Amino acid sequence: RMRRLTRYRYNNSPLDMDGHRIYIKDGETVWNPGWQPTKTPLDSYSCRHGLGYTILEGKKDGVTARQELFVPKGDACELDRVTVCNGSTVVKELDLFSYVEFCLWDAVDDSSNFQRNYSTGEVEVEGSVIYHKTEYRERRNHYAVFWANCPVDSFDTTRDAFCGVYGGPADPQAVRAGHCSGSIAHGWAPVGALHIHLTLAPGESHSILFGLGYIENPQQEKFIAPGI
């Protein structure tokens, strides 16, 4: 409860909209390997759960996207390997987005104490890494990190910028536009959104590894640089 990384709405309404989401934009068509949250009809779909892992695989218009999620034993992180394959006879220009919405740590307080919570969100971006460090400076010794193992073309860290002020994960504004806006969260609802453009020849595939991790430092070692 006190160290939740991603936001969860406890009444689960709307149903099954939260989580680590992968979006594929192929021309004007936007879809997810796991169908949710865009609910775009897929040509084929499978979901497999094993001991410590889940594999989602969807196919749309000749493109197959496979999402493999697991938590390594002994490590405080989730790894998400996404493999996109062009099974069509034409070159595909695709935009891939990986998205999570951060919880402000206390899972119960996160959905109730709005007069305070909406002023605490804080992030830092370095290359392909988004650090969620809400309250790290003030009173916490832990933070979260969301990253990709390759250069990204754009990013967002505010929900309003990625989803749109009146939008949501079912039809994100940034995905429809084909790129993120480079937003930096200062309060409100911090998120992690990473965008990568792919050009795939017929028969070509490409894999990207995304990670979501939790890091905790000893309280006395929070700041180790001189003068900080």
What residues fall within each predicted segment?
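Anionic coordination/interaction segments
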Residues: 1-228
